[in-house]
From Swiss-Prot:
Keywords: ATP-binding, FAD, Flavoprotein, FMN, Nucleotide-binding, Nucleotidyltransferase, Transferase
Function in brief: Catalyzes the transfer of the AMP portion of ATP to flavin mononucleotide (FMN) to produce flavin adenine dinucleotide (FAD) coenzyme.
Catalytic activity reported: FMN + ATP + H(+) = FAD + diphosphate
Cofactor: a divalent metal cation
Name of the featured protein: FAD synthase
Disulfide bonds: none
Associated pathway: Cofactor biosynthesis; FAD biosynthesis; FAD from FMN: step 1/1
InterPro entries in alphabetical order: Archaeal_FAD_synthase, Cyt_trans-like, FAD_synth_RibL, Rossmann-like_a/b/a_fold
The keyword rRNA-binding appears for this protein: no
Subunit structure: Homodimer.
Pfam families, sorted: CTP_transf_like
EC number(s) stated in the UniProt entry for this protein: 2.7.7.2
Organism, scientific name: Methanosarcina barkeri (strain Fusaro / DSM 804)
Length: 139
């Protein structure tokens, strides 16, 4: 049984997220998802939707076997329990796949890292695009 792990913020869940998770799920038999904690989102604006609500939405998706919140202190902590065979990265996630594989191996968590390419273009396939459209329409 091949266990897949995907991670992300999943703020304002949109078709781009669904595409990413669907492609990740296709890589194996079980899909686990780590939803970023509000406190760990430092590379972009803080999420609009709370971490608990984002977790609830991701867990409600039929393609996801189990979603859980990430660790506030060590991003590798949940991986010790999940023990994924493959980690799926989104096209825009800032991890270097080779460096991540090396760090995982050092921690006794060998896993292949696969980057999921950008989905077909759609007008509202990013949280930023959704926010811009809402501001444009409703100011």
């Amino acid at each position: 049984m091949t266990r897949i792990l995907a991670t992300g913020t999943f703020d304002l869940l949109h078709p781009g997220h669904i595409y990413f998770l669907t492609q990740a799920r296709a890589l194996g038999d079980e899909l686990f998802v780590i939803v970023a904690r509000d406190s760990n989102v430092t590379h972009k604006p803080k999420p609009i939707v709370s971490e608990e609500q984002r977790l609830e939405m991701v867990n409600a998706l039929g393609i996801v076997d189990k979603a859980l919140l990430g660790s506030e202190k060590d991003m590798f902590e949940p991986l010790k329990h999940i023990r994924p065979d493959i980690i799926a990265l989104g096209y825009d996630q800032r991890f270097n796949a080779e460096n991540l594989e090396e760090e995982l191996a050092k921690r006794g968590l060998p896993a292949n890292v696969v980057r999921i390419p950008l989905s077909k273009e759609c007008p509202l396939c990013s949280t930023g695009a959704i926010i811009k459209e809402v501001l444009k329409r409703y100011g």
